[in-house]
Amino acid sequence: VLILKSSIGNRSLGWDLLPPGSPRHEVETTNKKTGEKITLVTPAHNDEVRHASWTKGEVPAPPKHTWHAGLQYLGDVARAKDVLKNLGKYYPDATEYEVAGFLWWQGDKDRYNAAHATVYGKNLNQLFKALREEFDAPKAKMVVATLGQTNKDTATGNEKLIIDGMFAFGDKHKGEAAVVYTNPISMGSSSNAHYGGNA
């Protein structure tokens, strides 16, 4: 069994890890400062607007950075494919492989963007589809782990949107995907603090 792990932090599914095929989304939310209802737009994969989200009708000026929606996804997939292409380097005499599945434990950065949190489930569905296509693994399974600090019964706001999106994903893909509720086994602290060194 070969496990390929990408565990860079501070990345969101709604921006950095956004998979190919992801469209723009419009999300109605409330401006925290003014209390007014606003519509946020999330980018499509490799969108020409290189911002994580923006207010509808107010496209921001291009940023100085060259980052775009999905760039981390592209890099992660390319590095995994490179390992598989050179499999014999890591497993001498190995000539073929089968991608059996994917494990996803993420969501911390998406908590800080209402638009990303709202469409988390949609993005997760697209991620599963894209990964199966990328690795020519149409029957590969997926396991999604929730954020340890999020209690499914008491969660509110963006955390509730994300955990609900995760469970909706699991319900949609019964038999193909499963969701692991990690709150009962969490050892304290939170994802942005790496669970106090217990991540």
Protein language model annotation of sequence segments:
Residues 1-199:
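Cell-envelope and extracellular/periplasmic
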